């Protein structure tokens, strides 16, 4: 009788331990799932994301998606403004787009390199926000930082999924995470997009988020040197591109993207035109 009672107690202890472990796993999964971000967008400089895919982000936020932007540099080498003014402007743009968060990795503007140090900074962001989709700079562009940033982010997305690469943030070990998709937005060069997103209802918000960078665009009172994006008609050309991509895809305005791999559709329901 005593032996039977002891066996029962032992089994109950094992059961309690199993239940506790299952509960802990459930809690951890719940925590990680609530920390997940739908879209993590990277830009070599503050304003890259707004110019390249601001309309897409505004649209996704309106649909209830969580979007976070990470700027690689402070844009300190920009012809106009300072890193401090651009920091304030980036915060204003984030409010306009409705971002869940915005961070800056403080990499060296003009000298982006695909180094282990820079890769690991990005890996930590990917593991922190755990996005399904990453948006990154154009794969080829006028500014060398853009293509370098695109490759840097792409490599970091792969490395972030390797279990033997360990990272720690705020004293806690991070879980591995690899995004499902990496899409590159268009910038200065007219790269042929592989797909477009309809931003017809969000062009105004895209333009507003760009204009938050007051020091970077047309200002008739400015005494600072001119740049390719400070001309009076720059936003007209930005609007024209969106309009032209929209014309080609059967909508009013659109933003174009390239993909690092072939995109698979479940069906034709999501096709606009």
Task: Label every PLM stretch briefly.
Residues 12-20, 27, 54-56, 77, ...:
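A ubiquitous, low-specificity "background" feature that marks scattered single residues
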Residues 6, 63, 98, 176-178:
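Short, structurally constrained coil/turn elements
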